[in-house]
């Protein structure tokens, strides 16, 4: 084999090894983001670091109604995980958006439908809850005990 080809092959292998360390992104986050946009007027990024429960993880007492929406969403995902091999963060689903109405269309009782119902309920809850800017980007270690 030509030494130049070996170098190219080596470079490809090394870059693939680096890519293997990149964590996979949840597949349904795009769907959840779109549901949030359908149900309400705030951008989805407004919820990423809000309160004690919005965004990754969650602990302590929710700070307000919006934070309770996120806590309820977390618990809903926990319940969805109990049905067979259901991994909510990676499960895609079918739904329709007729602003501001959301309809989940997968078969009732399926993993996809359970996850969709969780995201739908959260998006509707987000749209109805007041937004307290003081709860965005808080220090969870001091405020969420």
From Swiss-Prot:
Keywords: Calcium, Disulfide bond, Hydrolase, Lipid degradation, Lipid metabolism, Metal-binding, Neurotoxin, Presynaptic neurotoxin, Secreted, Signal, Toxin. Binds 1 Ca(2+) ion. It is found in: Secreted. The keyword Ribonucleoprotein does not apply. Its cofactor is Ca(2+). GO terms for molecular function: calcium ion binding; calcium-dependent phospholipase A2 activity; phospholipid binding; signaling receptor binding; toxin activity. PROSITE patterns: PA2_ASP, PA2_HIS. One of its GO terms (biological process) is positive regulation of fibroblast proliferation. Its main location: secreted. Expressed by the venom gland. Residues 20-27 form a propeptide. Residues 1-19 form the signal peptide. InterPro entries: PLipase_A2, PLipase_A2_Asp_AS, PLipase_A2_dom, PLipase_A2_dom_sf, PLipase_A2_His_AS. GO terms for cellular component: extracellular region. It is an enzyme of class 3 (hydrolase). Ca(2+) binds at residues 53, 55, 57, 74. Its EC number is 3.1.1.4. The active site is at 73, 119. It catalyses: a 1,2-diacyl-sn-glycero-3-phosphocholine + H2O = a 1-acyl-sn-glycero-3-phosphocholine + a fatty acid + H(+). Disulfide bonds join 38-97, 52-144, 54-70, 69-125, 76-118, 86-111, 104-116. It comes from the Eukaryota. Snake venom phospholipase A2 (PLA2) that inhibits neuromuscular transmission by blocking acetylcholine release from the nerve termini. PLA2 catalyzes the calcium-dependent hydrolysis of the 2-acyl groups in 3-sn-phosphoglycerides. Belongs to the phospholipase A2 family. Group I subfamily. D49 sub-subfamily. This is Basic phospholipase A2 1. It comes from Bungarus fasciatus (Banded krait).
């Amino acid at each position: 084999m030509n030494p130049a080809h070996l170098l190219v092959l080596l470079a490809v292998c090394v870059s693939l090894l680096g890519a293997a360390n990149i964590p996979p992104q949840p597949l349904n986050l795009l769907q959840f983001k779109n549901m949030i946009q359908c149900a309400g007027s705030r951008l989805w990024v407004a919820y990423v670091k809000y309160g004690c429960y919005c965004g990754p993880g969650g602990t302590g007492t929710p700070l307000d109604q919006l934070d309770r929406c996120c806590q309820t969403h977390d618990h809903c995902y926990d319940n969805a995980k109990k049905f067979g091999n259901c991994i909510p963060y990676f499960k895609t689903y079918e739904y329709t958006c007729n602003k501001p109405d959301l309809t989940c269309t997968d078969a009732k009782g399926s993993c996809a439908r359970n996850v969709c119902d969780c995201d739908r309920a959260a998006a509707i809850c987000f749209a109805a809850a007041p937004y307290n800017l003081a709860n965005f980007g808080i220090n969870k270690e001091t405020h969420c005990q």
